[in-house]
Amino acid sequence: MTIQLDMYQTIAVAVVVLMLGNFLKHRIAILERFCIPAPVIGGVIFAIFTCVCYVTGFAEFSFDDILKEVCMVFFFTSVGFQANLKVLKSGGKSLIIFLILVIMLIICQNFLAVGLSKALQISPLVGLCTGSIPMIGGHGTAGAFGPVLEDFGVKGASTLCTAAATFGLIAGSIMGGPVGKRLIEKKNLLKTAIPEDNSLLIEEEKKHERHTSMYPAAVFQLIIAMGIGTIISKLLSMTGMTFPIYIGAMIAAAFMRNIGEYSGQFTIYMGEINDIGGISLSLFLGIAMITLKLWQLADLALPLITLLAGQTILMFLFTYFVIFNIMGRDYDAAV
């Protein structure tokens, strides 16, 4: 028996799953401590339910997830509006070094993913489902790139990427605190802690103040950036390279933000845009999670565990020996 849900029913189920996740997160301390997103909590429960229904032959669910892409582009467009060059410049040399280190980590993660997948005799594209896409990008990027990898022939790529992102979130939460604490105590770094100059951040926070009357304007700015983004995406596609659909919108949003910042001719309503982006992300993740097909992981269970274990070891070694040492071996570097 196949249970088909249209786009309205699909997003309604996603909202119910989101509400369930919020309910459980506020009542189960470990979920709050590890910062597990509410859509992931509720979505995993629902995905397990649909998996049991499928495996037992009771029912198979079919969703119309067309709104998932709309919510995804809304969210990543809101992220594009975060690109404020004034704030980036305030980071100075240390920010540039950190960005270079992150790029190095991304390269290492993908090399490891491809290398391990070849050793395990599986497709390198499957390995990439556990590389920088979920480990650096998180659930949002995992949900965006999953369909792209599926277009390249990786069956169940969305499920693989989402599973890896969930593991990465939990592993990072478990590992981050103890590693930072060990470095601080072992190197006696508390004495190197320097109070930060938060003047620019305070100024930036003022731009994030919310006004109810400005939410329509924020929606319009997001839609304009998305519209311009489609043109940019078409131009990028002419290069022959494959980009996620949201890249053009992110670029357009970044340009709009900085033109507004430097010209002073118009205001970007960042607080309202952040709120709309947050709602869009929750709906996007909700739809992405309820459409997971966990049974597709069965044949790749052992390789997936091996790949994720390798990524965990890499992350520990890179943060402990590379990032800490290059970023100055002080309190800020440890944190």
Model-derived features: positions:
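Intrinsically disordered, low-complexity non-transmembrane regions of multi-pass membrane transporters
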Residues: M1-I11, L20, K181-V219, E261-F266
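Hydrophobic transmembrane alpha-helices of secondary-active transporters
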Residues: V17, V44-C51, D64-G92, I251-G260, ...
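Juxtamembrane and boundary regions of transmembrane helices in multi-pass small-molecule transporters
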Residues: G115-I122, A165-E203, F321-R329
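Structural signature of hydrophobic alpha-helical transmembrane segments
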Residues: T2-V16, S62-F75, L125-S132, G240-A252, ...
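Transmembrane alpha-helices that form the ion-translocation and gating core
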Residues: L99-F145, I305-V335
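Entry/N-cap segments of selected transmembrane alpha helices
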Residues: N84-V114, V219-L222, D275, I290-Y320
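Membrane-core helix-loop-helix motifs of multi-pass transport proteins
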Residues: I97, L125-L189, H211
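Flexible hinge motifs at transmembrane-helix junctions and intramembrane kinks/re-entrant loops
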Residues: L24-V40, V52, G57, F61, ...
